[in-house]
């Protein structure tokens, strides 16, 4: 098996990374905005960044206010030890870089878990436009990036813990070239250019566990070696 070329330290200390869980007032990956570098073409933009957990929008702080970054031409984002790649307009965390591809992780908020039957979202309606700020960037890919109680960074940070915990789910993807493939048997088997019978035999012989990063690297190697042959 080929050696991993890159593995984010965050995958080994996931619990520590989420010492502060996201809340309904703070739907972000990190407990505060962090210094990072966004690579856009040949330029590097530095700012305080965070990932909104609704549609993967990249937010940053400018003059004390939260704004959405235009990532149309962005390639990568580095925040501390975490590396993100622009995958179909979302900044997804890179867990492993292998020969010819990547394993990335998407963290998404599960709002339905905190929306009560009466439609309440904490103490305000989920679709409220009177108590929440709607961030909009006409140049951004994700025109909808969720509601915030305020776009003033220090005020939103002060509200962070005065809310319900926001459950999240994590989705793994295999990225090869322009293909973003959900890391599951059905999605890989549906790829064009692969012999379904041979793939089935490979998955069985290797006892592929779709939750194991090492096994997903094997799948990447197999796809690259056998697709369109």
Q: Where would I find each of the regions flagged by the language model?
A:
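A short, solvent-exposed beta-edge/loop patch
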Residues: 155-220
